[in-house]
Amino acid sequence: MTNIRKTHPLIKIINHSFIDLPAPSNISAWWNFGSLLGICLIIQILTGLFLAMHYTSDTMTAFSSVTHICRDVNYGWLIRYMHANGASMFFICLFLHVGRGLYYGSYTYFETWNIGVILLFAVMATAFMGYVLPWGQMSFWGATVITNLLSAIPYIGTTLVEWIWGGFSVDKATLTRFFAFHFILPFIITALVMVHLLFLHETGSNNPSGLISDSDKIPFHPYYTIKDILGILLLVLALMTLVLFSPDLLGDPDNYTPANPLNTPPHIKPEWYFLFAYAILRSIPNKLGGVLALVLSILILMLFPVLHMSKQRSMMFRPLSQCMFWILVADLFTLTWIGGQPVEYPFIIIGQLASILYFMIILLILPTISLFENKLLKW
């Protein structure tokens, strides 16, 4: 009798994806972040579901319903902070996952890569709408500022913004629809994740050397299942440490003040994981230019397969490209820092220089260095 694992129509899909999947023998801990992102998504959907049971998406009661969750619901404070800080862990894993893809040339699987970029956009949209739901000061003003950016679109901009708002300002209609979208998007993300994995399993995983690993594969289970479990334990440890010791470390104190359209906070800024893009947006004095730069700062990831000039796939054996890659990482840290600072000297000029450097490295410096390294191989 053949094993049910290999014959049952449903179970065999799971078997081919997580058990008998041939995996390269040399993939490092940088390959753990895919599974960690899966765990983050599950945590977010579950905690979000329980929060939605007690939350009300009405401007009059939204803020007090969140207070009610934290004060009166059994372990409501835990669920709420796991959800809020789970988003931070999600983005940490996302950035590391994308960084791994850039470093090791995983973007040459361009269907997988492009679905990944779409996923990044979807997660960012979900996180933005989720931040609006508690209806604190930063929720309200963040929603106002970010949705207002669409008014920079020529001709249809203002109409589009009012259509998204459902009125002439961010109000009840906006909150209700944001809650609806925030609820549905994670399920769309889950479907996209399945497509992402489908395309990945068409080609198999990349590995640190960037070389074809068909001649040396090992089964995913038990080798990488046990490795993933270690990663998951560390992720949960980090998340629960954050939740139980300093749950408000990454939040904004302004969001503990109920939304007031008549009182603008002194510094409107998004959550930390959007600060790099926010800094790029602010570094251009023109509204439409800023919005384009903001979108391009993420969309530029789709250009990496086209901009790959090296004869080698991975950066493992390319010290000059490695150096530029880490300068790019440092630049992103700089942009994140600038995004959280007020718009004044010297932060304005630092932000502008960091923004120029960001696009320069990706569009010009990395491809040029790759071509130079190709020449070095001949000498």
UniProtKB/Swiss-Prot annotation:
Keywords: Electron transport, Heme, Iron, Membrane, Metal-binding, Mitochondrion, Mitochondrion inner membrane, Respiratory chain, Transmembrane, Transmembrane helix, Transport, Ubiquinone. One of its GO terms (cellular component) is respiratory chain complex III. Binds 2 heme b groups non-covalently. It holds the Pfam family Cytochrome_B. Coiled coil: none annotated. The chain crosses the membrane at residues 33-53, 77-98, 113-133, 178-198, 226-246, 288-308, 320-340, 347-367. It is a multi-pass membrane protein. A ubiquinone binds at H201. One of its GO terms (biological process) is mitochondrial electron transport, ubiquinol to cytochrome c. Signal peptide: none annotated. The keyword Repeat does not apply. Heme b b566 binds at H97, H196. It is found in: Mitochondrion inner membrane. Its cofactor is heme b. Changing T241I: In strain: Isolate MVZ 152779. The cytochrome bc1 complex contains 11 subunits: 3 respiratory subunits (MT-CYB, CYC1 and UQCRFS1), 2 core proteins (UQCRC1 and UQCRC2) and 6 low-molecular weight proteins (UQCRH/QCR6, UQCRB/QCR7, UQCRQ/QCR8, UQCR10/QCR9, UQCR11/QCR10 and a cleavage product of UQCRFS1). This cytochrome bc1 complex then forms a dimer. Component of the ubiquinol-cytochrome c reductase complex (complex III or cytochrome b-c1 complex) that is part of the mitochondrial respiratory chain. The b-c1 complex mediates electron transfer from ubiquinol to cytochrome c. Contributes to the generation of a proton gradient across the mitochondrial membrane that is then used for ATP synthesis. Belongs to the cytochrome b family. Heme 1 (or BL or b562) is low-potential and absorbs at about 562 nm, and heme 2 (or BH or b566) is high-potential and absorbs at about 566 nm. This is Cytochrome b.
